[in-house]
Amino acid sequence: MRSKTFSVLSSCLLLIATVQGQLSGSVGPSTSISDKKAVKTCNVLDYGATNDNKTDVGQPIMDAFEDCGSGGVIYIPDGDYLIQEWVSLENGTAFAIQLDGVIYRNGTTTSQGYMFGISGGSDFELYSSTSKGAIQGSGYLYHMNGEFTAPRLLHISDVSHWSVHDIALVDAPMFHFVIDDASNGEVYNMAIRGGNSGGLDGIDVSGDNIWIHDVMVTNKDECVTVKTGSHNFQIENIYCNWSGGCAMGSLGSGTNVSNIVYRNIYTWNSNQMYMIKSNGGDGEVSNLLFENFIGHGNAYSLDLDSEWSSMDTVDGDGIFYRNITFKNWKGTETDGESRPSIRVICPEATPCTDITIEDVDLWTEEGDSETYVCKNAFGSGACLKSDSSSTATYATTTTVTSAPSGYSATTMAADLTSAFGTDASIPIPTIPTSFYPGATPYSALAGSS
């Protein structure tokens, strides 16, 4: 919960962020928590919930929403709660959920879908006043049996002016947090921790005017990934701590993405520092900035791949990528010769234009050389060709045999030394206070005040 003074400071910081980044307007709830509490507080304990991890809290939350969903705060006090009935809250206005307890998925339920879904409406906030609230999905109970088509944890859909902050999402049976066609939102001060397997995405996001910052993700798939239909995003201070890494896609027919900034992204022992992935399709991706990236121990680094083999080819001449800048990248990857540290692969029928690779200094951890691969990509830097007016297609590989100056980069104290498996319970993490070397989080943890 933010004080009035802090709200003013946050607004000033947001103004700075809007000027420096790609946000198109204000983000977050329209009214404060104190204003919402002044209307009404609905304690789930008064609606039949008990914090004994035995009695379903899902229905009490939905019953509390009937009284507080048009103005007020649904309060889930400290303690352990069992969820059996999935929560679906639709078209609420001027309400919040204060999750100070921990919600555990009932391990015997076979329900699919989203455990916690908020759809429609506006002026919404999900937060923990102690920064200790969490949703524990106990996904390992599925994964240990080889099941990965399973419930998801949190879904924000078609909501305007909202925020999610100061909570942890843990061990999702499938995806952790999906933001779908939402607008004017803010996500911050979160820890997401999942099993070491594909399909356990951290944050997947689409919509307009969304600020995601100060988030740590551990899993084996998407860290913070932008989907088609995304515009005016600012994503910064992201800690992919043994993850799949951040990405865009996969993109197919009718792709429409513009005005996206990723800044201050730290990636440790993940699949990639950043990947844009498509295979065929059509549409346009434009006006992207990827600035201040640090990586260590990753399989791939800078990877724009319009021939991504992990997806089926989609009908179309390929997506048109234009005006994309990669700037100030440092660090290492595991094997820069067998997996190029810079790879920009663009469609033959729709070459990429206005691509800039500037101060991208990466080096291999194995061997003594690395490669850059470019195909049908025009701009400046690395192996890119400069003449986009040419109709000739091309493909080139450049071998680098000496480490670039300035590639060395710091590590983070919380870098994991091993992954979390898929056959045992995953502990709930403490939300960190640092998400990128030298960068101060925009908002102090709610529990620190």
Curated annotation (Swiss-Prot):
The catalytic site is made up of: D221, H296
GO CC term, one of those recorded: extracellular region
Record's InterPro entries?
Answer: Glyco_hydro_28, Pectin_lyas_fold, Pectin_lyase_fold/virulence
| Pfam family for this entry, one | Glyco_hydro_28
Q: According to its UniProt record, where is this protein located?
A: Secreted
Disulfide linkages recorded for this protein, renumbered to the chain, are C42-C68, C223-C240, C346-C352, C374-C383
* Gene Ontology molecular function, alphabetical: polygalacturonase activity; rhamnogalacturonan alpha-L-rhamnopyranosyl-(1->4)-alpha-D-galactopyranosyluronide lyase activity
Q: Which reaction does it catalyse?
A: Endohydrolysis of alpha-D-GalA-(1->2)-alpha-L-Rha glycosidic bond in the rhamnogalacturonan I backbone with initial inversion of anomeric configuration releasing oligosaccharides with beta-D-GalA at the reducing end
The record's section on SUPFAM superfamilies has: Pectin lyase-like
Query: Which residues does UniProt assign to the signal peptide?
Result: 1-21
Q: Name one GO biological process term.
A: polysaccharide catabolic process
Where does the record say carbohydrate is attached? N53, N91, N106, N241, N256, N323
Enzyme Commission no: 3.2.1.171
What family does the entry list? Belongs to the glycosyl hydrolase 28 family.
Q: What is this protein called?
A: Probable rhamnogalacturonase E
| Species per Swiss-Prot/TrEMBL record | Aspergillus flavus (strain ATCC 200026 / FGSC A1120 / IAM 13836 / NRRL 3357 / JCM 12722 / SRRC 167)
Q: Which gene encodes it?
A: rhgE
